[in-house]
């Protein structure tokens, strides 16, 4: 984790140090912001490590309600960025409630199953009613996220929910049904015009950036060029031609992996992916060694969340 924090900070700094349009003339602006975010994250992480996960179980309903309130507030008074009303400004910090909702959904689903199988119900296995309950827990935040609309977060949440349902031991036909429903729902959404035009364009550009390299496919095309520039060993930190020129939009956020690809090359990118893999492996190990069902489902769900989000981000950059 320490390696990811250090490497991520350097990549963010490299992506922004030459971008006066982002930094307002202070080359270290995003470096400072990243360090503040890391400090907050480390403090919260230490607090969570020092807390028995059974307390998390007790607080799960409160966390869930708070996340739903946050999602409602962002629809009412949030800031719109890139077509999605997803951010709240709190004390000078920008907060994305949907990120907290992912955690809330995971521990909420874990609590439901644990209470049904280990609590007063004393079931031996997860039943159909339990799966429906998990889907209801996930459904409310999902609807609020779609209203923003934030399709990327919705995909991560859907994959996470699918993972928790699978880990819970739900009947296999539920997994098949959920997968089929997701595919069918996506097709219907496209055909019925539920998705915004720019969302459809982004998907088409992801599948084939060459269709519109100057329009919808521009981001993905520039990302692929940056990664291709890196070769095996990269152009060197702070030396990437695409990065220094600012050709890759949102490079300090959604396309941060392109900085690694261009400046650290195949070798550096492989190291970054390996570090992500170590974190994922540790999360899965914690899930497998948890001494109760709630802990196993919560850790497993967080592993699914982290793993799919990393896969989505790297895959989006690679095109």
Regions found by a protein language model. Give the residues of each.
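Short, small-residue-rich loop/turn micro-motifs
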Residues: 15-16, 227, 231, 318
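Extracytosolic (periplasmic/ER-lumenal) interhelical loops and adjacent juxtamembrane/interface segments
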Residues: 215-238, 242
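Hydrophobic alpha-helical transmembrane segments of multi-pass inner membrane proteins, especially
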Residues: 2-14, 20-219, 258-317
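Long extracytoplasmic/lumenal interhelical loops at the membrane interface
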Residues: 232-267, 290
